[in-house]
């Protein structure tokens, strides 16, 4: 499990252990390794595969000797896992219950999908900003799939070999803009701060069965909606396979697989994405239209 922390003015990778986070730079020094300490570079270079293999073979035990290198997550600010993915794919209405929330039908043959710019991206604890142009903004907890290698025309049964890991995501929508016209989907999804990403990347070896993961949208500590991955209309396996038939997928590309339900957010709210076995992603909400918020 990887996290990204802001250390000495730079965002660097760290490995999660039972004792806390150990900077990857410290691991490199201790074990004479050269893994990239930037999380996106670690993925794109193929270094994450080597790091995972080392961790499974001997690294998990070896890290137990590095308690002096553990940094407190409270002492350093967590960051998004990385900031410049080549692609952010979002999947809409992938749970029937969420489609009903919007008085829509779940797509059948082809998943409803959209893309988001990387300027939407924020990390744990960063403020989600409700923009002037929206009077009704919603937040959605989602499972994120991070692609681990360049791939095209992936068979569904091979999907997991193309995945670097999984993470928690909060996707934001200016719902009132979307409801005006479905062609406004891209605009409604593309405001700054409308995609929170992190705090940990969980590699596939840590998850016995992705389909059993429970995904929840939580508002102010109360579960607004939850469902399990098995109930998705389009499974993560299908999504990786299908999207790879549309375009080449690249290391670090993100697929946000859809939400069990969206909640309307307002100034002062706390939004959370919970996924069973994952560290939760939490973000406060600020409304730009509030007094003194400009």
PLM regions and their residue ranges:
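Catalytic-pocket segment enriched in acidic/His residues
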Residues: 56, 71, 75-77, 98, ...
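Residue-level recognition of short, solvent-exposed, well-ordered loop/turn junctions
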Residues: 83, 123, 138-140, 250, ...
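N-terminal non-catalytic cap/leader segment that marks the start of a structured domain
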Residues: 1-107, 208, 292
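Structural signature of FAD isoalloxazine-binding scaffolds in flavoprotein oxidoreductases
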Residues: 16, 105-124, 139, 272-277
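A generic local secondary-structure boundary/capping motif
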Residues: 3, 77-80, 101-104, 128-137, ...
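Non-heme Fe(II) oxygenase catalytic core, chiefly the N-lobe of the double-stranded beta-helix
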Residues: 119, 124-159, 169-172
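Short acidic-glycine loop/turn motifs at beta-strand connectors
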Residues: 7-9, 16-20, 147-149, 219-221, ...
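Short, conserved beta-strand element in jelly-roll/cupin
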Residues: 114, 144-149, 240, 252
């Amino acid at each position: 499990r990887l996290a990204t922390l802001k250390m000495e003015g730079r965002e660097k990778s760290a490995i999660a252990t039972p004792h806390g986070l150990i900077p990857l730079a410290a691991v490199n020094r201790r074990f004479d390794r050269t893994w990239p300490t930037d999380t996106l570079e670690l993925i794109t270079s193929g270094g994450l595969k080597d790091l995972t293999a080392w961790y499974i073979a001997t690294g998990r035990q070896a890290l137990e000797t590095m308690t002096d290198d553990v940094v407190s997550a409270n002492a350093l600010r967590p960051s998004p896992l990385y900031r410049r993915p080549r692609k952010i794919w979002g999947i809409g209405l992938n749970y029937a219950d969420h489609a009903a929330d919007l008085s829509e039908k779940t797509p059948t043959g082809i998943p409803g999908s959209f893309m988001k710019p990387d300027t939407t991206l924020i990390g744990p604890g960063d403020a989600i900003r409700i923009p002037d142009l929206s009077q009704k903004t919603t937040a959605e907890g989602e499972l994120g799939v991070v692609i681990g290698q360049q791939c095209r025309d992936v068979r569904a049964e091979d999907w997991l070999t193309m995945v670097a890991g999984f993470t928690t995501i909060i996707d934001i929508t200016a719902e009132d803009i979307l409801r005006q016209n479905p062609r406004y989907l891209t605009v409604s999804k593309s405001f700054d701060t409308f995609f929170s990403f992190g705090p940990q990347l969980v590699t596939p070896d840590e998850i016995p069965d992705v389909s059993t993961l429970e995904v929840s949208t939580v508002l102010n500590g109360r579960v607004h909606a939850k469902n399990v991955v098995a109930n998705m209309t389009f499974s993560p396996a299908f999504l990786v396979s299908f999207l790879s038939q549309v375009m080449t997928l690249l290391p670090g590309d993100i697929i946000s697989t859809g939400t069990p339900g969206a909640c309307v957010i307002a100034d002062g709210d706390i939004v959370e994405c919970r996924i069973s076995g994952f560290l939760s992603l939490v973000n406060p909400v600020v409304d730009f239209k509030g007094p003194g918020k400009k």
